[in-house]
């Protein structure tokens, strides 16, 4: 494994809690006056010299498999007997053959051997097994000296970018704390909403709510009622309650438009670098659908100005989701 110790970004956590500003670039900026014959890497993080935006150039991933609608289990690399699952399993992880970052930083998490399952259809027991694996892999990757932050995530649906339809998620291990994650998990960062109009479901230890100012028309956050930093810090009851909430919320989302809704899901956890003692674990789920099979595209004014226009009122979404429970 590569040691990126000297290549880590130094991050300054401002006292005002605004977040993290990148002080040192890990990679050279694009050299517009350089030798045109210089080899251009297929996988390289770059930083916009004006906006400070980090963009990972991942040309090598253009060749990855694209089988979003495959129905034959014999063709699926994630089904038992397939390329990535030669033996029977309940849950399974492996290093991604088509990584977005070098150094064994990208892993795939298989939720179930059932090709036609969804995350929600696994039930509480099945989702709990996935959470256990998420926690295990988060801590294993975070123990590496070249890892500062671990992001667990899932893309569901071909329209979101999933290239294989078998139920699975992924994990990325960063050698720095991305700016958004630093803001959420840092001082004066994210905490659960106190607005009862936005909370729509809960159990003994977890609560689900619609964010106050969501970018996407469908957006939900699930979090512990008491502050916990990472998945591994949840006790057995907490993990069970999180599994219950995930299965519940994902089922409601599919009922929202009477269809399997495409979504993006990710887990915000405390980074492994210092300065994040106040981090509050949460799971975000968003979908671009503003109606059945009708996505809301983030358009020119939003991309250009960096301000967004959401046609769905958060309080109304929360009320609808509340009505869709069992």
Predicted regions and their residues:
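N-terminal non-cleavable signal-anchor helices
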Residues: 2, 12, 19-23, 28
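Gly/Ser/Thr-rich active-site loops/lids in small-molecule metabolic enzymes
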Residues: 239-245
